[in-house]
Amino acid sequence: MAEHVIIGNGVAGIKAAETIRKHDPDGKITMIGDEAYAFYYRPQLPEFVAGKIEEDRLWGKKKDFYEKNNITSHLGKTVTGIKPDTNEVILKDNTAINYDSLLIATGGSIKRRNYPGSDLNGGIVQLKTIDDAKNIKEKVKSAKSAVVVGEDFLTLSLTEALHSSGLKVTYLLRGDRLWPEIMDKDASDILLLRLKGKGITIKQETDIKEVYVKNKLIHGIITTDDELIDCQILGIVDKLQPSIGFLNESGVNTDNGVLVNNKMLTNFDNIYAAGDVAQLPADLDSDIPEINVRWLKAWKQGQVAGSNMAGNDAEYDDIASISATQICGIDIVSIGVSNPLNGDYKIMRGDYPHPEIDVYKKLVLKNDRVVGALFIGNVQEAREVTKVIKNRTNYSEIDKKLLKQMFDLNSRFGTFHGFLCPVCKLELPIPPDAKVGDKITCPACGIELNVTEKMLK
Ligand SMILES: Cc1cc2nc3c(=O)[nH]c(=O)nc-3n(C[C@H](O)[C@H](O)[C@H](O)COP(=O)(O)OP(=O)(O)OC[C@H]3O[C@@H](n4cnc5c(N)ncnc54)[C@H](O)[C@@H]3O)c2cc1C
């Protein structure tokens, strides 16, 4: 009987476990995760912090899921090393667990930059785990204001969550724009306007010079412009770094993340990696190897890895870099190379940006082929454009109706009546005969939802 071991109890790990169980009903499955909780929906943490949803809406699996599926779980346990020569995983308490096939699905952890005074942990927060979310909710009770510094979408999520919790929030951007990985300046300006409209103070090209601490408590920060800003909560967020430290002595090939091929296989023939920790080769001629934080990507890669661990021959053939989210009520979808930095790319963006409309759409071409796209505020054509990019279509071959709908402001709102899945944030098709209270399942990530009046509007 095969022994499958999965390190990481996030979406990539859980999807792999479910897939293995489907293909190998009798195989032994062991899951190890350092968070002491059953699987939960990480992208819903900001809404939980903001008090928009209760804790019970976070759970993706009940505690008895593991027992019911004959999975041995070690939750709250940390893996400190693996030994491919003896097929062993080593836990912090030195327990060794044997495997025939192993999945590394350890995601990433938020790197925090240090500033003078920031070694005092008291008021400094981050939002990655359910424990982080609970910690923030507790601190918000006695706080009036917060400062957040950073530019990518984890920082944006934290900023929005703190603001929605009722705090006065100042957001420091070290550069001139938000989320530079996917956004050009015009796209970023649309979102910045929305954040300002909500009452969030934005300071661009400003960093922290010093954290102002009194009686071991954070009282504020001093900016690089020598301004003192009061705050009791401080969010410092840098990029998510793949959690690969425990692989140092293992011989598993890593770069930024664990290097895998499109079967999610590492350089060992029985060790796989999937999700935020995995690094696929560059796709779409982008020169940029992809390892970005994306729920749906982790979900699909877990499925491919699980299938292969159970003896199949599955391949991950999606675009590695699709990102869908919602910030301040604005839908954002980025596909492929959405913000190229060198001059080999051509940008098509029709009538956008427009000073009065907070919608923005663009296509990125390389040698006439569409290699990337960005949608802000209206994501109506995102699914169609994903197919265009995946099929390596030339710009001249794209359906003219699709281009008109994307770029012609007169048809900008077209017929989109979609609803975005609260977990994977991709369009959720609502059946035409759906009624309030019916149950529907997101075809992309599998979450089950009750149909509400809002969805039917
Ligand atoms: C606040 C927030 C909002 C987000 N919003 C969106 C969104 O709107 N859209 C979107 O597409 N994505 C979003 N994401 C990103 C998305 O959640 C991730 O891409 C996804 O969770 C990655 O899944 P994973 O299984 O690869 O890793 P993870 O979900 O990070 O799970 C990995 C697990 O492995 C554990 N682990 C790590 N090291 C060890 C070890 N040595 N031993 C044992 N266990 C270990 C970790 O603690 C963790 O529990 C959001 C993330 C956050 C934090």
Give, region by region, the residue ranges found by the protein language model.
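FAD-binding core/adjacent interface of flavoenzyme oxidoreductases
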Residues: 1-5, 59-147, 205, 222-226, ...
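FAD-site-proximal beta/loop scaffold in flavoenzymes
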Residues: 120-141, 215-217, 222, 227-304, ...
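Short cysteine-rich clusters marking metal-coordination/redox-active sites
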Residues: 421-424, 442-445
